[in-house]
């Protein structure tokens, strides 16, 4: 029984580390966005504000929606989604958008924190990635963050 307990503890520890990265990302992206804001944006690329607006849209339209789907449907099916920049509150500016992203991300992380064991075990089917449980969705969220952080480097 001890090896199983150690494995479960390891999985939980890895999940907690991913949740920590998800929660800390608003500060990480804020620093990167402020550094990038002083440089010209290459043609065809998003400005730092547009990247952060995109991250808001992804949290609202993808991450939070899929977590709600897991709670409401037996086995939800998800398509590939890559929303553009969040269009609301156009006058916010970079700092305002970063603040909004922090609030939205806090809500997303909160949705993960309220999951019980059954919630973490529920699964849906993604047309590209196959079966995903809540931890699989969390992995995708962290990977997506890192991808966009790299674009501001």
Regions found by a protein language model. Give the residues of each.
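Acidic/histidine-rich alpha-helical segments that form the ligand environment
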Residues: 21-22, 26-32, 83-122, 141
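Extreme N-terminal tail/first-helix region
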Residues: 1-24
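Short, contiguous alpha-helical
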Residues: 1-8, 38-81, 123-153
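Short alpha-helical segments used as structural interaction elements across diverse proteins
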Residues: 12-15, 50, 63, 102
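Hydrophobic alpha-helical segments and helix-packing faces
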Residues: 15-18, 22, 44-48, 60, ...
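Short secondary-structure transition/capping motifs
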Residues: 18, 52-56, 97
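Acidic/His metal-coordination segments adjacent to aromatic residues that form catalytic metal sites
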Residues: 10-13, 84-97, 128-136
């Amino acid at each position: 029984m001890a090896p199983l307990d150690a494995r479960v503890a390891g999985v939980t520890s890895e999940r907690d580390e991913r949740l920590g990265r998800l929660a800390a990302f608003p500060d990480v992206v804020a620093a990167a966005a402020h550094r990038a804001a002083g440089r010209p944006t290459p043609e065809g690329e998003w400005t730092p504000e547009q990247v952060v607006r995109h991250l808001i849209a992804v949290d609202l339209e993808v991450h939070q929606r899929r977590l709600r789907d897991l709670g409401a449907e037996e086995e939800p099916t998800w398509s590939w989604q890559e929303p553009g920049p969040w269009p609301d509150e156009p006058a916010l500016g970079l700092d305002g958008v970063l603040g909004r992203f922090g609030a939205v991300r806090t809500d997303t992380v909160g949705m993960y924190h309220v999951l019980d064991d059954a919630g973490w075990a529920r699964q849906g089917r993604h047309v590209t990635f196959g079966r995903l449980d809540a931890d699989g969705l969390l992995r995708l969220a962290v990977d997506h963050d890192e991808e966009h952080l790299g674009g501001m480097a």
